[in-house]
Curated annotation (Swiss-Prot):
Name this polypeptide is given: Class I hydrophobin E
Alphabetized UniProt keyword annotations: Cell wall, Cytoplasmic vesicle, Disulfide bond, Glycoprotein, Secreted, Signal, Vacuole
Induction: Under normal conditions on SDAY medium (Sabouraud dextrose agar plus 1% yeast extract), hyd1E is transcriptionally active during the first 4 or 5 days. Hyd1A is the most active at transcription level under normal culture conditions, followed by hyd1B, hyd1E, hyd2A and hyd2C in order.
Residues linked to a glycan: N83
Amino acid sequence: MKFSIAAIALAAVAVASPVEMEPRTNPSTCNINGNNNGKVVCCNSLIPILGQILCNIAVLGSTCNAGQTVRCCETDANGGLINISLLNCVG
């Protein structure tokens, strides 16, 4: 009895076919208004006014430094220190 249960379980595992998975989205993009055209930026929150303007776009696979806040901005900029479109950011 145990052998037949083990054989059936093994057959069920062997027959299970993998399901086609949805491709992963780019980790450096974020969702604005239901589409993935936003960019993830890291802003310095410790500096009161200037820190919110000095935002750098997160490079693929990188993380923000300690003391920075993460925002999702609608911008076409590829990188850089200053984000001109900060008003288009979601915090």
